[in-house]
């Protein structure tokens, strides 16, 4: 039995942001890393929706929006410069212009970002909550003390000949948000930022963990809540219609075939793979199925079936 009643998953900016062409953000919609949705699905498949909460610290939430606004300004300026250069090059040979439909100036885009950010939160597919940063006097004093003494996540940064001990203020706000909101439950930060490493994974508090990918999140939750890969695949068989159709297709059933009365016979796991035997009714006939499924790759590796002899059926 887990020593925690709840787990809180916190997303850092560098994990949530989704970029294309190397470094460009999607400016017309609030797009997040596809791994975010993988984590949502994983929590459902693990049967942990009542125990795990997805959280976005408000500092991260504001930073995601600010990055969009800054990128819009930069890209708009860059495009205008290129258009002017093209006009000079082509002269009367071409008519070159660009028209913005909804966002004529920067203030329009700032309002637009607020709208698409809220649309993201309102999407039924998204189950994250925005977690406010603690603003009480004790928290502020602790953050200031950490900044003065360059205690992680603060660090000394150089600019010219000067040294600054308050680099990492944003990270400090995120950390104290996590610390306050998690309390004595399990807190997991999903981030690619190494500056957090000294504060997580037991070095600061035993209930705070850090990782940077979906598989590690799954491993932490599996260990803390005693969930096996076999358990997860069993849940998938009862909830994932696409997986059932893949199994039926591999076993050469017709496309519109339906499976009823599915019952697990045995289930064992080996690393990321699960081997499952189950029985089910197909058109009133009882079959025995054997499958191998890779949970990390979400891939059906093997599937076979045979009719169960009625004289041997349970």
Q: What positions do the PLM features span?
A:
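Active-site-proximal, substrate-binding regions of enzyme catalytic domains
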Residues: 2-185, 195-312
């Amino acid at each position: 039995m887990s020593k925690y009643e709840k787990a809180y998953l916190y997303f850092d900016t560098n994990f949530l942001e989704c970029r294309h062409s190397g470094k460009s953000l999607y400016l017309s919609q609030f797009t997040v890393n596809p791994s975010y949705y993988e984590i949502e699905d994983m929590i459902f498949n693990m049967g942990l929706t009542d125990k795990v909460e997805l959280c976005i610290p408000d500092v991260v939430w504001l930073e995601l929006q600010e990055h969009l606004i800054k990128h819009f300004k930069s890209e708009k300026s860059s495009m205008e410069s290129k258009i002017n250069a093209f006009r000079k090059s082509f002269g009367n040979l071409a008519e070159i212009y660009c028209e913005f439909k909804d966002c004529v100036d920067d203030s329009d885009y700032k309002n637009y970002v607020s709208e698409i950010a809220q649309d993201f939160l309102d999407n039924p597919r998204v189950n994250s909550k925005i977690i406010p940063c603690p603003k009480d006097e004790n928290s502020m004093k602790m953050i200031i003390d950490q900044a003065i003494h360059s205690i992680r996540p603060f660090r000394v940064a150089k600019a010219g000949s000067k040294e600054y001990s308050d680099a990492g203020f944003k990270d400090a706000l995120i950390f104290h948000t996590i610390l306050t909101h998690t309390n004595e439950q399990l807190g997991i930060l999903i981030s690619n930022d190494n500056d957090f490493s000294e504060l997580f994974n037991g070095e600061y508090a035993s209930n705070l963990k850090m990782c940077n990918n979906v598989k590690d999140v799954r491993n932490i939750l599996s260990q803390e809540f005693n969930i096996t890969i076999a358990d997860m695949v069993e849940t998938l068989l009862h909830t994932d219609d696409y997986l059932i159709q893949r199994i039926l297709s591999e076993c050469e059933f017709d496309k519109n075939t339906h499976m009823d009365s599915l019952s697990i016979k045995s289930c064992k796991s080996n690393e990321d793979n699960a081997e499952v035997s189950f029985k089910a009714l197909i058109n009133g006939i009882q079959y025995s199925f054997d499958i191998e499924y890779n949970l990390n790759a979400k891939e059906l590796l093997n599937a076979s079936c045979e009719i169960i002899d009625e004289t041997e059926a349970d």
